[in-house]
Amino acid sequence: MSAQKLYGSHVPLAPLSRILLGIGSAATAITDPRRGDMVAAMGETTAVGPVLENIRRRMESDKIGKKLLMEKPRISNETIDRKWLAQLPDGTLGKHYSNFLERLNTSPDARPTVKYIDNLEHLYVMQRYRETHDFTHIALEQKTNMLGGSSSEIF
């Protein structure tokens, strides 16, 4: 456990607290997948360091991935132009993303900020994963239910 806050939203957890939050958030996320806060907490409390480290290393070994890790761009209402995306031709990723956000009446900013990751190098990996998760749903044509979310996780 990190005894001190490593970043603004960081909530350091003792090992027992992490386990209990993981179990509780998983139970809540399964019974009510609309609880994005619990889905996020489950993902963070069950994310094991070696998995995040493997993703980080893979990103670092790729030219574009390395650039992402250096620049740390975010996907938010501030960085995307939703009106422009909505005007894109049908069949484009941007148009699919716009339709996805509209259909769910949501926005990129609705995703919770990472709180329970105790490693600064893994912080961006988890945040980026969370912000790009919708693209996986779109590419795999998966619904935003438990089965669709699980399928997207495996992908």
UniProtKB/Swiss-Prot annotation:
It comes from Caenorhabditis briggsae. The lineage of its organism: Eukaryota, Metazoa, Ecdysozoa, Nematoda, Chromadorea. Pfam families: Coq4. Belongs to the COQ4 family. GO terms for biological process: ubiquinone biosynthetic process. GO terms for cellular component: mitochondrion. The keyword Phosphoprotein does not apply. InterPro entries: Coq4 (IPR007715). This is Protein coq-4.2. It comes from the Eukaryota. Keywords: Ubiquinone biosynthesis.
